[in-house]
Amino acid sequence: MFDKINKTLDFNQNLLNLYAKRQEILSSNIANADTPNYKAMDINFKDEMDKITKKSNLDITLTKTSSHHLNPRKKNFFIFEVKPITSKEIQSNGNTVDMNRERIEFIKNTLKYEENLVFIKNEIKNIMNVLKG
């Protein structure tokens, strides 16, 4: 039972990390909308989601270089592949940021992040109710 709970929470934690990283990328694109030659970036959400589902990157281990370092209990490390967005519209200064796309993706990503937080909150609430009896 606890293994299933742990897997559910780990999956959702990794999903939150993915949404947070994407939010950083989208924010950077918006902030650099007027920067000459800036290339808009993003992650392929489906590919990164597949990595989380398959847990292919969870085997990364840390090396202790000091006896004062803590031993990691969880392997929750993902290396997200950030790629330039192929844009149909390139500004005269070489910038490829499409503000309409960035705003829409930013809002969608924010809503998905919040939705996942609510899901985790409800899962924890349900677990607490079961434990209380």
From Swiss-Prot:
Species per Swiss-Prot/TrEMBL record: Buchnera aphidicola subsp. Schizaphis graminum (strain Sg)
Protein name, please? Flagellar basal body rod protein FlgB
Instruction: Enumerate the subcellular locations listed in this protein's record, separating them with semicolons.
Output: Bacterial flagellum basal body
Gene expressing this chain: flgB
Q: Which GO terms describe its biological process?
A: bacterial-type flagellum-dependent cell motility
Q: Which NCBIfam families match?
A: FlgB (TIGR01396)
List the residue ranges forming a coiled coil, or say none. Answer: none
* GO CC annotations on file: bacterial-type flagellum basal body, rod
Recite the UniProt keywords alphabetically: Bacterial flagellum
* Membership in a protein family: Belongs to the flagella basal body rod proteins family.
Q: Which InterPro entries match?
A: Flag_bb_rod_N (IPR001444), FlgB (IPR006300)
UniProt function note: Structural component of flagellum, the bacterial motility apparatus. Part of the rod structure of flagellar basal body.
